[in-house]
Amino acid sequence: MALPSNFLLGVCCFAWLCFLSSLSSQASTEESQSGASENVESEADPWSLLLPVDGTDRSGLLPPLFKVLSDRRGETPKLQPDSRALYYMKKLYKTYATKEGVPKPSRSHLYNTVRLFSPCAQQEQAPSNQVTGPLPMVDLLFNLDRVTAMEHLLKSVLLYTLNNSASSSSTVTCMCDLVVKEAMSSGRAPPRAPYSFTLKKHRWIEIDVTSLLQPLVTSSERSIHLSVNFTCTKDQVPEDGVFSMPLSVPPSLILYLNDTSTQAYHSWQSLQSTWRPLQHPGQAGVAARPVKEEAIEVERSPRRRRGQKAIRSEAKGPLLTASFNLSEYFKQFLFPQNECELHDFRLSFSQLKWDNWIVAPHRYNPRYCKGDCPRAVRHRYGSPVHTMVQNIIYEKLDPSVPRPSCVPGKYSPLSVLTIEPDGSIAYKEYEDMIATRCTCR
């Protein structure tokens, strides 16, 4: 009886070992498959590295620009804007921002968002519906779904693009009749405004329609229906001189908006810190110019330290006295070799597979802070007193308390020109996108 019992025990042990080995192989296979899928997903969606495991941003920790683009998942916009409209917005971008995407401090406008919409529908009416002139009116329908509730209209412009054949040295007086379809039932006469310009010097015609569209945009109207008649008279010639403007494409609608959300950059809040005179009262011959405080603190501080070091070395000469060595010893506590400072990190939006959306800038340098924080940090880094207290606690009382970390202390905004999913073009200024100063906290 002992032999069969031992045999049964051996069979059970062998079966149990086989079961455990199959479980371990299955777990390793699933782990490798999940790791491979995670690698594929991270390659396909670079922003997935910024999200939790389930891919949702519950805490709202994503930077505003990254959050906007992460919702699009790298898809190509379904509609592409007209090339002339895109060219106009690129020129606008160069006027407002530098090549690196930083908003120019010389600008004085209050809007931080500009949206260009192309008409989603265009229909030419019959001649019986004309308001004035020999040309029929053109119906234009603009879809404003991309305008958010936090974006307030400051100015609206109807943009016409002129053909190259329209160049002329003659003075042309243009009359434009605009009718908002929703307002025709009230029986009011269509607004009319004269514009005088020389075609040779203009590629675009901008017609201010703020007074017409302000009530509609304020009331969150998502669809604007306009009827437009655009005729011009050359050299003030009477009726036989009236001709049609050679327009290459239907007009676009441009909205200049003030985005009041927290993710947008509000330039009027930093005007005092951006501009300041360099001369004191009573001084003459010194011109006032814009001064960027962040640039001064970031760029001049290292140079000043290097200059002071050179002066001290020249004064001391080749003699290495004990006092000089002692000063060098104490200086390593105040200015460590691997001190906390800004570092560049230049990347291209094509590396993140966001170049389908972002037209400008092509490259982005967010910069980052790296290095050791010295013991005396308040004067140089603008750190609070708490940082010094934390340093003392770490050194004297409890080493488990972390030392102050080298982190960004100030940021600058980033101007971005993007193509929206509906084919519209948007210029936006995002807050806190480029580190400009480091601090220890």
From Swiss-Prot:
InterPro entries xref list: Cystine-knot_cytokine, Growth_differentiation_fac-9_C, TGF-b_C, TGF-beta-rel, TGFb_CS
GO molecular function annotations of the record: cytokine activity; growth factor activity
Glycosylation sites: 163, 229, 258, 325
Signal peptide: 1-29
Post-translational modification: Phosphorylated; phosphorylation is critical for GDF9 function.
Keywords noted in UniProt: Cleavage on pair of basic residues, Cytokine, Disulfide bond, Glycoprotein, Growth factor, Phosphoprotein, Secreted, Signal
Broad class of the protein's primary localization: secreted
Domain of life: Eukaryota
Tissues and organs where the protein is expressed, per its UniProt entry: Ovary. Strongly expressed in germinal vesicle (GV) stage oocytes, MII-stage oocytes and in zygotes.
CDD domains: TGF_beta_GDF9
Database matches in Gene3D superfamilies: Cystine-knot cytokines
Chain segments annotated as coiled-coil in the UniProt record: none
Biological process according to GO: negative regulation of cell growth; oocyte growth; positive regulation of cell population proliferation; regulation of progesterone secretion
Pro-peptide positions on chain: 30-306
Localization, UniProt: Secreted
Keyword Plastid: no
Cellular component, GO annotation: cytoplasm; extracellular space
One Pfam short name: TGF_beta
Disulphide-bonded residues: 340-406, 369-438, 373-440
Family, similarity comment: Belongs to the TGF-beta family.
Self-association and partners: Homodimer or heterodimer (Potential). But, in contrast to other members of this family, cannot be disulfide-linked.
Further information: Ovarian physiology and fertility are controlled by endocrine and paracrine signals. These act in a species-dependent manner and determine the ovulation quota in different mammalian species. While humans, and mammals such as the cow or red deer, normally ovulate only one egg per cycle, other mammals such as mouse and pig can ovulate in excess of ten per cycle. The mechanisms that regulate the species-specific differences in the number of follicles that go onto ovulate during each reproductive cycle are poorly understood.
Record function comment: Required for ovarian folliculogenesis.
Name by which UniProt lists this protein: Growth/differentiation factor 9
Species name: Mus musculus
